[in-house]
UniProtKB/Swiss-Prot annotation:
This is Orotidine 5'-phosphate decarboxylase. It comes from the Bacteria. InterPro entries: Aldolase_TIM, OMPdecase, OMPdecase_AS, OMPdecase_bac, OMPdeCOase_dom, RibuloseP-bd_barrel. The lineage of its organism: Bacteria, Bacillati, Bacillota, Bacilli, Lactobacillales. One of its GO terms (cellular component) is cytosol. It comes from Streptococcus pyogenes serotype M1. It catalyses: orotidine 5'-phosphate + H(+) = UMP + CO2. Keywords: Decarboxylase, Lyase, Pyrimidine biosynthesis. The gene is pyrF.
Length: 230
């Protein structure tokens, strides 16, 4: 099911920056935000509690990757924060993914990271020694996530159609690396515009710097939201 709001990546490290950014939006504007490693490691669980207290949805993107027992226990702790979505690395294997699902329970959305959108095929082959194509690797990880009863996968928009063809109905695709037309792609290798992601079937999109570093973040958010809605 398509999420109507683009998820805003809160690429900050301090509470003050985060609060100042969120304060730009009207109180009635309920956002869906992503808390990544930088902000969570700097501010801890309290930043999640604060954002939830404002009525926003939280995607906690920590990409857990450890032995199954450790991941199960960590997810059980994160569940207590009332998060709406979490991530694990698909490379941890099906047993680890199943453990993550057990720890988090059935309420929050749980998605698997396949290949990072900063990873090129040459990098994958050289650094990870995976000698298939990048798409084949993404599909392999996505099928493992579905087998473990996860809700979806993180992938580039170019991979969405292929993933949906090999996974059960309802398996969702979250697409980072979204950039409005004409913007700087930064360190992302595989990017699309909100309109392209919508047309190709992405269920969630994540947008960071084009909103958080815009001269008018609220206007930038509303423009991207409108493009995503079609």
């Amino acid at each position: 099911m398509k999420e109507e709001r683009p998820i805003i990546a809160l690429d900050f490290s301090s509470f003050e920056e985060t609060k100042a950014f969120l304060d730009l939006f009207p109180a009635e504007e309920k956002l869906y935000v992503k808390i990544g490693m930088e902000l969570y490691y700097a501010q801890g669980p309290d930043i999640v509690r604060y954002i939830k207290s404002l009525g926003h949805n939280v995607f906690l993107d920590l990409k857990l990757h450890d032995i199954p027992n450790t991941v199960r226990a960590a997810m059980a702790v994160l569940k207590e924060l009332d998060i709406d979505m979490a991530t694990v690395h698909a490379a941890g294997g099906v047993e680890m993914l199943k453990a993550a699902r057990e720890g988090l329970g059935q309420g929050p959305t749980l998605i698997a990271v396949t290949q990072l959108t900063s990873t090129s095929e040459d990098q994958m082959r050289g650094d990870q020694n995976i000698q298939t194509s990048l798409l084949e690797s993404v599909l392999h990880y996505s099928k493992g996530a579905a087998k473990a009863q996860l809700d979806g996968a993180v992938c580039s928009a170019q991979e969405v159609e292929a993933i949906k063809a090999v996974t059960p109905t309802g398996f969702t695709c979250l697409t980072p690396g979204i950039r409005p037309k004409g913007s700087n792609i930064g360190d992302q290798k595989r990017v699309m515009t909100p309109n392209q992601a919508r047309r190709i079937g992405s269920d969630y999109i994540v947008v960071g710097r084009p909103i958080t570093q815009a001269k008018d973040p609220v206007a930038a958010y509303q423009a991207i939201k409108a493009e995503w809605a079609g």
